[in-house]
């Protein structure tokens, strides 16, 4: 797919997701929209026993390891107060954390992987994870066993503090989570 065509496709996909946000474990339309787009691109969808979320797979023509690529698809219970032409049409819900962008970016990666699968060494499982904003979305996906053969899973998150075109990479945890803890330490001098 030509760059301009891909950009237009992903922009439209992003805007549709942004206009129709769904909360954790309620991502039914989002799930169906993702499935339709993946199927239209000839990308295989794995059947997993979850009501929302999608796992797809691109099998490379060459043998190799299996990797995962992950994004989150749920929105937040926040009213959107913008005048964007693609602002949320769902009262009290919006993609305030960038999950619409994450989904569009990973969908774009899936399209490119599918387009180049003859050159691909190994397999890529692509997770459109439900319920990231709750504390159990990843856990429910992992419990299905669909990622038991994966060597590593790569995820992404927008970062407004980085300049456009910059990629930030770090081993270990990078961002906050929905579970919180408090740590107190004492020292003796």
Description of each model-found segment:
Residues 46-47, 132, 171-176:
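Short Gly/Pro-enriched turn/cap motifs at secondary-structure boundaries
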